């Protein structure tokens, strides 16, 4: 594994379905928002899924993203609080992504992954996204706070996610950033 800047890595990766494991620290938001900001500077359509759109818009403004000037390219997608509702709508949202424009997606997953049923469903969703990824022109970053994944099923779930992604970013406030790509 190589240690480096996560945003630079994502920026140089090209089109890829990426899993981003993190500790939900300030560094996490800095990485996500910097990735979005760089896409907006290139006039790429940037999507951010969240359970709290107003708070994310506020945080983006504080980070230095001009959300009003970039409203044509910045798309904040509200996701349901309950995982069961989320799992139904996310695949529809993926189908709605522009296929001719360059895109960047940060898809946040702040659910409590505390059962194999939830992790199996999430792995199934990720595989569906990956199966249709060739239709997208850009990066799709699936952002997971590792502390929301129950210890007993964490290893199994992480392995399931590796099956449907081409690159992995591990980032913690203490440990920094490690990345690797999969064949």
Model-predicted segments: where are they?
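Non-catalytic regulatory/interaction regions at protein termini and inter-domain linkers
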Residues: 1-183
């Amino acid at each position: 594994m190589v240690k480096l800047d996560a945003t630079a890595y994502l920026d140089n990766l090209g089109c890829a379905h990426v899993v981003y494991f993190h500790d939900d620290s300030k560094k996490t938001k800095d990485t996500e928002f910097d990735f979005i900001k760089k896409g907006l500077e290139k006039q790429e359509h940037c999507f951010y899924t969240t359970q709290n759109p107003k708070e994310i818009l506020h945080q983006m403004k504080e980070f230095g993203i001009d959300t009003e000037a970039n409203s044509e390219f910045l798309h904040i997608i509200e996701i349901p609080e309950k995982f069961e509702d989320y799992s139904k709508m996310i695949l529809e949202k993926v189908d709605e992504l522009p296929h001719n424009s360059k895109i960047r997606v940060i898809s946040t997953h702040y659910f409590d992954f505390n059962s194999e049923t939830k992790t199996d469903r999430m792995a199934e969703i990720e595989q569906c996204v990956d199966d249709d990824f060739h239709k997208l022109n850009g990066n799709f970053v699936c952002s997971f706070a590792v502390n929301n994944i129950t210890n007993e099923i964490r290893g199994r779930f992480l392995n399931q996610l590796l099956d449907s992604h081409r690159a992995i970013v591990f980032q913690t406030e203490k440990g920094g950033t490690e990345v690797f790509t999969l064949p």
